[in-house]
């Protein structure tokens, strides 16, 4: 007689073993209809799972946090069923859930076309409308291998052969299609209504370029029509805002094959870059950071001592000279410790905060490169704080204040915080991990900042906090981080003299706010759709004459504003003023100044904004004040 405890604490007693779906039906027919799966004693199970003894049960519906993953995983199987129905000779491989959707890899004799994709999606809809029941069975590993070999699914059989022989495996069947999966899955295909196939791409079998090229079909799936429509709208917005397109449109940067993953900054783009660098230099100096600069190319012996040569060797660019091996630095931390080690430090010197606009190179796979968002050469707003263990909380608190101020200045208010705790493989004592994790959590709690734990996701050398920004169309970008490191300072012989005269190893806090300049600028381009706030705009003002008669005066205005430190250009072309205004509006210049005979006589300018608002006539000095006020707001409303 199982007693089922529900999330609200209420209990229901049943005379016989009962399925999750039947419990839902006992609660009410509406819940039964909405049931996708269940969570029994913390484990996700199918709606048809039988509960034989007392248990805690949560019913998973589309409104549950787990519901969307069940829908997406089940839709991946629906995709595979549709492909096998239309292309029986295709072989299935893997089909995991990813952010916002899923994919499934297929081996097939020819490339899938856009027409194929449309036909597959249509077939998926037909299979959904048939409301085919989904059932589960369990087989020993060797029987599962034989089953998939017998139906010609060699890739699937190969996957199963890599699983230990003593394991049983679950298979899910819907109609005449059966696939390997841990589950859970929806009770029937009729639960899968709101999906869209997005694209086809190539993917190597098992991710190895030496293996066969497969075809990866990407799709998205949602719990309801509204969410699907909203997601597709976000994709349209993201396409319009693609930083690669806007970078070309606004002449900010380019990339080319001769230097893959490395940015060629144009004058306008470099103007944005240097504005950010100057700003970060100022705020870090004001917050007690000492700026340093360390070498680009360092002997392998340092990377061996730091552990990077063993753990990160494939991601490093290396060079040999005079029988010595060097690496172009992929990160700055070992070099910062070398600066710390110059001269014995006392506890009175701590905390010591180093900052570097550190140029790094990582040998990312060419297929992972994406515009300036994922590159091989990048600059970090990198910093390392050397402190005693008992200072971790206060340093994290100070850093968090700085991070929020910076994000607000760039126009970001919505910050998502995650705290990653100890992984299975780690260094340091449990006591030190306990104290460090508590210090990070206490620093966030003391400020009333909401955060979620990511158990086991910390680095091997210590726990970390990650800060992600939500942009204007709802996308989330991980940018900032602060990480506790017990390991590297000891490996590289960092010490300080404690108050009792003993030699102790400092804790090192790795920290960044923007992450990489390249990626952060890409985020800004897309967030603002190229319309940078005035303080960042590569050209803050354009001065335009109506006729040649005002050309000299327009140049005088430009020089006057430029001497005030503003970024100003003039447009003296013999074109109609309406044409000039339209062109510079398209280029998203924040302020457009028009000068005619009247403005020239009155030493004034007619002011328009890129949004098309006519601000009227200002004296040059008054406009300079208006512009200075606008710049001073930075990205804040």
Curated annotation (Swiss-Prot):
Disulfide bond sites: none
Location, primary (coarse class): cytoplasm
UniProt: Zn(2+) binding residues: 333, 384, 510
GO molecular function: ATP binding; metal ion binding; threonine-tRNA ligase activity; tRNA binding
Cofactor(s) recorded in Swiss-Prot or TrEMBL: Zn(2+)
Cofactor: how and how many bound: Binds 1 zinc ion per subunit.
Taxonomic superkingdom: Bacteria
CDD domains xref list: TGS_ThrRS, ThrRS_anticodon, ThrRS_core
Subcellular location: Cytoplasm
Coiled coil: none
Gene3D superfamilies xref list: 3.10.20.30, 3.30.54.20, Anticodon-binding domain (3.40.50.800), Bira Bifunctional Protein, Domain 2 (3.30.930.10), Threonyl-trna Synthetase, Chain A, domain 2 (3.30.980.10)
EC annotation from Swiss-Prot or TrEMBL: 6.1.1.3
Biological process, per Gene Ontology: threonyl-tRNA aminoacylation
GO CC terms of this entry: cytosol
Occurrences of domain TGS (ranges): 1-61
HAMAP family per record: Thr_tRNA_synth
Family statement: Belongs to the class-II aminoacyl-tRNA synthetase family.
Record note on quaternary structure: Homodimer.
Full protein name: Threonine--tRNA ligase
Species assigned in the record: Teredinibacter turnerae (strain ATCC 39867 / T7901)
